[in-house]
């Protein structure tokens, strides 16, 4: 969403989605676009709109991995860990990064840090490239969310200065 093209694309997709929902017209929209709109609604504190969109996305794409992951994270956010875990366990591609991060977060939330660490090491690539540092950023956020500052710093401080989201990493380091 950082590029002008994406901003324009997202605005157009939101306008189309909202217009079609408002008129009750049947329409198709791919799952990835719907999840971009859902993320926008969440970041804009439009919870009702995000939930309504998820109901639509689930009907349109009931087996889509991305839709299922977002649904699970919504449930987790509402404190419905068991229901969320059921969805995550039902996703065919258990190697999915977001699925693995969910399991790691579950272990951290339950203070099973050694288990989370084993899962983390199993999933991190042997050689890190630019996009792989997203793992470190996500892990840092997870550990901070549950009060494990030293574990968070272990990952956040390994993120290179030229990483595209380094400013977010610096914010998290300051928070720790």
Language-model regions: role of each:
Residues 47, 81, 113-115, 149:
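TPR-repeat structural position
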Residues 50, 84, 116-118, 152:
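Single-residue signature of alpha-solenoid repeat helices
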Residues 32, 65-66, 98-100, 132-134, ...:
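Start-of-helix register in tetratricopeptide repeats
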Residues 39-40, 74, 106-109, 142, ...:
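Residue-level signature for tetratricopeptide repeat
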Residues 62, 95-96, 128-130, 163-164:
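Short coil turns that delineate tetratricopeptide repeat
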Residues 44, 78, 110-112, 146:
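Structural motif corresponding to the intra-repeat A-B loop/turn of tetratricopeptide repeats
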Residues 36-37, 71, 103-105, 138-139, ...:
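Structural register within alpha-helical repeat arrays
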Residues 18, 22, 55, 89, ...:
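Alpha-solenoid helical repeat scaffolds
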């Amino acid at each position: 969403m950082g590029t002008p093209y994406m901003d324009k694309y997202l605005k157009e997709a939101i306008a189309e989605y909202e217009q079609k929902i408002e008129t009750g017209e049947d329409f198709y929209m791919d799952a990835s676009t719907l999840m971009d709109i859902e993320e926008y609604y969440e970041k804009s504190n439009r919870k009702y709109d995000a939930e309504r969109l998820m109901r639509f996305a689930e009907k349109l794409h009931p087996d889509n991995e991305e839709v299922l992951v977002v649904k699970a994270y919504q449930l987790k956010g509402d404190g419905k860990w068991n229901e969320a875990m059921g969805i995550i366990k039902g996703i065919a591609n258990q190697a999915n990064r977001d699925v693995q991060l969910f399991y790691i977060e579950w272990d951290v939330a339950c203070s099973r840090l050694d288990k989370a660490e084993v899962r983390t090491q199993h999933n991190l690539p042997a050689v890190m490239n630019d996009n792989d540092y997203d793992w470190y950023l996500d892990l840092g956020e997870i550990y901070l969310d549950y009060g494990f500052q030293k574990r968070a710093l272990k990952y956040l401080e390994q993120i290179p200065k030229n990483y595209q989201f380094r400013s977010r990493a610096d914010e998290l380091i300051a928070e720790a």
